[in-house]
Amino acid sequence: MLKRKLGPEDLRRLETPAIERESHGQTSAKSSVPDSASTVAVDFAGVTKSYGNKIVVDELSFSVASGECFGLLGPNGAGKSTIARMLLGMTCPDAGTITVLGVPVPARARLARRGIGVVPQFDNLDQEFTVRENLLVFGRYFGMSTRQSEAVIPSLLEFARLERKADARVSELSGGMKRCLTMARALINDPQLIVMDEPTTGLDPHARHLIWERLRALLARGKTIILTTHFMEEAERLCDRLCVLEKGRNIAEGGPQALIDEHIGCQVMEIYGGDPHELLSLVKPHSQRIEVSGETLYCYAPDPDQVRTQLQGRAGLRLLLRPANLEDVFLRLTGREMEE
């Protein structure tokens, strides 16, 4: 099957940058850019958004410093995607103010977006274009000429580790390769801020670790990243700071380890295989706190050996001792486990 190449109609479409077409003669993409000198990349102040009678984002406030990876951590329905859409000016808040790269949003969202790269949750690549053509076409949405795009495409292919796949159709790529291409495409305009919505959802562990390694490379370049995720390990590995969301509210904010130390502060003993309510009286005297979720008993114990001693001889029990993590923080703050 032959690959679909850019035809005459595609090339004519590329002659006029998309931003210029949208602006109907207004200032071109290169004549004005967001403020890159600000120490605050993103600021939400008292932002609220409702759909009908349902409050999706509830008086949310947070700030993201330039050069940091900031996580929005929460289950589906916590408001993560709505926050991302408001940040991009695609959804208007009902109340509060949003500033992105020194620009008020949504009032000047078009200007702000010139300094933003977006990696959506689901790939929206052109399946019949080649890897190189996907990058070339996307560059036009930022007012880049073919020559300008071609000058940066080799470095983007190297970043995505797709040098040998430059002329392959997207449909020929693995899931991990597609995510890397989507990341490379988001970098075509050398953005100051990168917004990533659930970047590793649906990927196998190997591909997930590859994406994490590429994200760390972006942070080393001084890029600012806002990451929405429900993967606790992802947030712990990548985020300098994060905001824990529950029903659109900011219920905790800080560095991953700082949040763990503040809200948990000790090791966790997970107990399976018995009635957790029957075990409470045995382990409670030796635990700072106990949480029950389904059939699992979580004991936050300064001295786990004392808990283990109390449970010796009880048939069918399984014990798992582990360090505290962000899952425990979420359970502590909300009374339930993180759900996909």
From Swiss-Prot:
Its EC number is 7.6.2.-. GO terms for cellular component: plasma membrane. GO terms for molecular function: ATP binding; ATP hydrolysis activity; transmembrane transporter activity. The keyword Cell inner membrane applies. It is found in: Cell inner membrane. CDD domains: ABC_subfamily_A. Signal peptide: none annotated. Residues 25-34 have a biased composition (Polar residues). PANTHER family: ABC TRANSPORTER ATP-BINDING PROTEIN (PTHR42711), ABC TRANSPORTER ATP-BINDING PROTEIN NATA (PTHR42711:SF5). Belongs to the ABC transporter superfamily. Lipooligosaccharide exporter (TC 3.A.1.102) family. This is Nod factor export ATP-binding protein I. It comes from Mesorhizobium japonicum (strain LMG 29417 / CECT 9101 / MAFF 303099) (Mesorhizobium loti (strain MAFF 303099)). The lineage of its organism: Bacteria, Pseudomonadati, Pseudomonadota, Alphaproteobacteria, Hyphomicrobiales. The gene is nodI.
